Amino acid sequence: MSASTSTTAAASQDACYISLLGLAEYFRTSQPPNIKKCIQCLQALFTFMPPSKVEARTHLQMGQILMAYTQNIDLARHHLEKAWSISEPLANFDVKFDTASLLAQLHLQTDQNSNQAKAMLRRAVELSQHNVYWHCKLLLQLAQIHASDREYSLASDLLAVGAENADEAGATYLKVLFLLSRAMILMIERKTNDVLALLNSAGQIIDNNIPNPHQKEYLKVFFLVLQVCYYLALGQVKTVKPSLKQLQMSIQTIMAPNWPSDETIFGANQLEMFVWLPKEQLYVLVYLVTVSHSMMAGYMDKAQKYTEKALTQIEKLKQQEDKPILSVFKVILLEHIVMCRMVMGNRELAIREIAAARDVCLAAPQRSLLRRHSAQLHCLIGLYSMSTSFFEHAERQFLVCVSETNERDLKLFANLNLAIIYLRTKRDTDLKQILDAVSSENTNTYSSQALMGGFYYVQGLHAFHKNSFHEAKRFLRETLKMANAEDLNRLTSCSLVLLSHVFLSIGNSKESMNMVTPAMQLASKIPDIHVQLWGSAILKDLHRMSKDAQHEKDAYANHLKYSENLIADQRKSVQSSHHELVNWFHGDPPVTSGPPTTTAVAMILPDSSAAVGPVPVIASTSTGMQQAIQPVGQYGQFY
């Protein structure tokens, strides 16, 4: 065959490829898409015996389309595996990396574990060392999988490698993304000194070495979210305020109408085509951390307002595209709502919203959300059971929570509430055992100031019930010192009302009044119906002792009002079909029916009688926001 004939044949073949690809794209973008004909056009390419690179790319395209538009996972896997086997040995051919990334995603969807996905990505990472873009993208994807499997050290190591690679390539923006992602992982690992060092390093680079103002603002939001979560994890509600205010201002800047689209900001340079979360999801996340702060500070109205806005925004985004991260945000918000409802004495709404959180978890593919949030749900049901005096159920729920979670703060929180149950049911041996265990586990370790304040409160409560009033005062003053230092208003109000009861018990009515008055003022602001009920009972006794009949009558009327409200709510709660959740101890939670939930808010409770309610700590039962916080993905693939 002559050279001219060969050239003509090749040109004709190229024309066929282009025509078939164009036709396939036409069918894919039709309204509605005609995926069957699209696939047929791509399949027809193979009849021309195309070169290896064209064949591999076509198999990749078919796998992509089948994954995106159909349920035919097996056929998608076949084409992707074919693309991988052809492309893997070919040098300077990016199709292998795209294929490996997609195959890893497919393995995660279909396999019982992530081993194959990790193996595929490790091989691709090894092959991509001379391609900075793909090397970094694959490192992020592999780190994400290790983080999801709670293999935090491996995830951290991969992110450190990514930061080094980005630095060597002069990709400063990408380097900061790796540094902040690693700081997030270290935060989950409780490596506080390392977190601070990384945040400081990243903060300096953001301030001094990011010339693009829009990318700088995005990085600042990522940085501030981590900084706020860091302080909240420590229970430092007062310390975090300046950072939270900065974060709220930054997100308003990003959400302004004149702000460029994410495509414009991140689409110019290949090594800048990475974002942590798109701005619409960042907006929800900022609401979420604001809710968490409002709860810890004891501002229920603010928490409710921000939760309503966040849930509304989530529903809007779900209508556009139902990303998995939105369900994570929703579950965490509902977990907050539930605790808030119980603080305010709305247990019937609380159990409804626990059921709503259960529904979101059950709807997620492969029960992935339920696996992550099962311990939190058991903890919430334990709190609900406790508040409705189902103590045996509450105990079992907390024990399940402790056995299921590796999160130290959640375990501490559940154990402190178990201590309250043992105190209330007069199980002194169990109480001593759990207090000793909590003390030994948390003496030399990083813990939330709010939770440690709660621990001192429980010890004060224990001393009060033993009539060891001097010891009770010592513990409660320590609690107050911690609570006042960081504006933990609910912990303050609970400690003050218990301290008032201590002084009342030893006949010091003046000091008792000095304690109960600010306790009631704080409780009305929160509002915390349990502290109000308890405080009104103390006030009634104090006014009776001082022979102030009118004030005694007023205090009694208030006490009666709070009591009647709680009794009425208790009746509605136990009659609700969702109350059946108190009997869920293993497996999938039962599906219950009932009226739909309203958009609402979240927190935690004590009880009406002598200081024996759940631990007065406004602390999220969510795992430190780690579900909401995730390593960055490439723009257009926010996984």
UniProtKB/Swiss-Prot annotation:
CC terms in the record's Gene Ontology section: chromatin; nucleoplasm; nucleus; SMC loading complex
Location of this chain's protein in the cell: Nucleus, Nucleoplasm
Start and stop residues of the TPR repeats: 453-486, 493-526
This protein's UniProt keywords: Cell cycle, Cell division, Chromosome partition, Mitosis, Nucleus, Repeat, TPR repeat
Source species, domain of life: Eukaryota
GO annotation (BP), single: cell division
Self-association and partners: Interacts with Nipped-B to form the cohesin loading complex.
Family membership: Belongs to the SCC4/mau-2 family.
Function: Required for association of the cohesin complex with chromatin during interphase. Plays a role in sister chromatid cohesion and normal progression through prometaphase.
Protein's name according to its UniProt entry: MAU2 chromatid cohesion factor homolog
